[in-house]
Amino acid sequence: MAAAGPEPRLLLLLLLLLPPLPPVTSASDRPRGANAVNPDKLLVITVATAETEGYRRFLQSAEFFNYTVRTLGLGQEWRGGDVARTVGGGQKVRWLKKEMEKYADQKDMIIMFVDSYDVILASSPTELLKKFVQSGSHLLFSAESFCWPEWGLAEQYPEVGMGKRFLNSGGFIGFAPTIHQIVRQWNYKDDDDDQLFYTQLYLDPGLREKLKLSLDHKSRIFQNLNGALDEVILKFDQNRVRIRNVAYDTLPVVVHGNGPTKLQLNYLGNYVPNGWTPQGGCGFCNQTLRTLPGGQPPPRVLLAVFVEQPTPFLPRFLQRLLLLDYPPDRISLFLHNSEVYHEPHIADAWPQLQDHFSAVKLVGPEEALSAGEARDMAMDSCRQNPECEFYFSLDADAVLTNPETLRVLIEQNRKVIAPMLSRHGKLWSNFWGALSPNEYYARSEDYVELVQRKRVGVWNVPYISQAYVIRGETLRTELPQKEVFSSSDTDPDMAFCKSVRDKGIFLHLSNQHEFGRLLATSRYDTDHLHPDLWQIFDNPVDWREQYIHENYSRALDGEGLVEQPCPDVYWFPLLTEQMCDELVEEMEHYGQWSGGRHEDSRLAGGYENVPTVDIHMKQVGYEDQWLQLLRTYVGPMTEYLFPGYHTKTRAVMNFVVRYRPDEQPSLRPHHDSSTFTLNVALNHKGVDYEGGGCRFLRYDCRISSPRKGWALLHPGRLTHYHEGLPTTRGTRYIMVSFVDP
């Protein structure tokens, strides 16, 4: 049942008994043009009890067009009901009634009343006034498709040939005396419904004619989004963005995200009027910057790190924490690890982390906290500490390659802001551009442009995760409840984002800088001894950083790092020491070395002409990964070293060979069954073994001191007849591939 409202007949009687309206020139008698009304005589009145981000966005758009704005209710208690869920809003009329007493006799004054939290102004006062004068009204209300709050009143509305039929009270514009005559009739409770009040006045035919009340049926001035999302598109000019109503071919001046369309308004507000333009880029990005002053200590930060699932390259992640370009004595570290598998990694890094940051706290898997409970605990640590000025949440699958990330986000001066991160070469990111009706992922029209950084700026989005910064004051004043992440059965990050959105706090995302990337974790198999080795497909950039020699690119670029110790035998850096060690350890962990016999059941024919003590990559499940390494790194180097040859980098024989004095110390002269052969030393001569090396008999050229991680690349069959020289002490390991057999 709607809140009690005034009866139309009673209102009409009251209005007829009032003194006559001050003379107002009929709109039909006024000149029709942009200069029909002086913009200086326009006043925008709005209502806001708190300076929310929605309110600041409204003011920002008003200031862009030089509107004069008067705000009612700032700092006062809202008693107008929960208008987001039910009827209410009468308090707005009471405030407006009092304010309009100032303008009751100003017949040339035009007032536009709009909401503020969910409104954006899209064009100038001049255009607004021109359209108002052309309407021929004394008071023009916005229109929508829904007869709210009483559907039973729908049949009393005049028929409309084209356009929206029903009144919406979120925006109206009119001559000050007319508005005063309307709102002075309000004598109801603050939580009675304002829209019902205006509706009942409008529905009286005599009153409608007497006061020249009308609706903006075709959204020439007011665009209410509820029920009209399919009608609205963005219209891009070089330095301006408008919304266009394609149903009526109009360019509205006021955009109102009424009802459940707040997120769609946030999307439009990223562009309108100049949030982002094709020529100017981000129009508002630098207006709120808070540059951290030099010579003064920066804000105190709680860095909350979460290891919630087995995560590749975790030791590298922990080391990157030490590289943040922010004074470590201003950072306290909270680390939650739910994975027993990662306890050794954290134990190795913990002494450094303890020495680096001002305070540290570790919560391990023995606490049996859920991901939501751990996040609530960390966030509350900042909330309860008045000295905690910023809360920086960081998941272990977020790779921050930009050490200035924390500083950049703080200087953006937003309540909540995340750095844009995505998986390498993928569209998977740490934000959603839109939500589906059930509040799960939906792709916004600009999602790809944002992920690929074709549009750069600071964006208002409905969902962020994995890395974000929140003001400590925001936690203490606007998000005081402890259970933010564990308050529902949904994913903790979804629960957090919903809690923030419901408070009217914007979730900002910055893609102004390259901040880093996300790791893929779903196929991370910890059954391997060194599971990171298998990440060449899922996380190729991180895999390369960990396993490909730091000088490989320089060698490929022709910087003089490739050597030729024998004719057509090339020597170049390929693998890191870590990869060499982990390959050897994987082989020894597997342990099923061949016996170096001619009979070999692993081969199609069951016979090996030149046997070695070895383990094939297929045996340890690493064949596909090694072939990807050949395609990505060995193939380009081969074509660089042998101009005119194009390799398919196909190899069916990929294996690690072990040489020992008491097992198989050497290998007799032979040709390889390949177009070219790759031979990588996996350990150090003089440290791990003595002797060894390779001799090319045709040239009587030997390589007696192989370098760990460096690859020999040489032709196989026909020309490069060679032998493995005896290993005299220790154990020598090499990785061999017969390529393009």
UniProtKB/Swiss-Prot annotation:
Detected in blood serum, heart, brain, liver, kidney, lung, spleen, muscle and testis (at protein level). Highly expressed in the heart, lung, liver and testis. Detected in the walls of blood vessels in placenta and embryos. Detected in chondrocytes in embryos at 14.5 dpc and in adults, in adult kidney mesangium and vascular poles of kidney glomeruli. Detected around nerves and in the adrenal gland. Keywords: Dioxygenase, Disulfide bond, Endoplasmic reticulum, Glycoprotein, Glycosyltransferase, Iron, Manganese, Membrane, Metal-binding, Multifunctional enzyme, Oxidoreductase, Secreted, Signal, Transferase, Vitamin C. Pfam families: 2OG-FeII_Oxy, GT_PLOD, OGFOD2-like. The keyword Transit peptide does not apply. It catalyses: L-lysyl-[collagen] + 2-oxoglutarate + O2 = (5R)-5-hydroxy-L-lysyl-[collagen] + succinate + CO2; (5R)-5-hydroxy-L-lysyl-[collagen] + UDP-alpha-D-galactose = (5R)-5-O-(beta-D-galactosyl)-5-hydroxy-L-lysyl-[collagen] + UDP + H(+); (5R)-5-O-(beta-D-galactosyl)-5-hydroxy-L-lysyl-[collagen] + UDP-alpha-D-glucose = (5R)-5-O-[alpha-D-glucosyl-(1->2)-beta-D-galactosyl]-5-hydroxy-L-lysyl-[collagen] + UDP + H(+). Fe cation binds at H670, D672, H722. One of its GO terms (cellular component) is extracellular space. Mn(2+) binds at D115, D118, H256. Its cofactor is Fe(2+); L-ascorbate; Mn(2+). One of its GO terms (molecular function) is procollagen galactosyltransferase activity. InterPro entries: Collagen_mod_GT25, IPNS-like_FE2OG_OXY, Nucleotide-diphossugar_trans, Oxoglu/Fe-dep_dioxygenase_dom, Pro_4_hyd_alph, Procol_lys_dOase. One of its GO terms (biological process) is vasodilation. Disulfide bonds join C282-C285, C382-C388, C566-C701. It is found in: Rough endoplasmic reticulum; Endoplasmic reticulum lumen; Endoplasmic reticulum membrane; Secreted. Residues 675-718 are annotated as: Important for dimerization. UDP binds at V47, A48, T49, D115, S116, Y117, G259, P260, T261, K262. N-glycosylated. Residues 1-27 form the signal peptide. Residues 650-741 form the Fe2OG dioxygenase domain. Homodimer. This is Multifunctional procollagen lysine hydroxylase and glycosyltransferase LH3. The gene is Plod3.
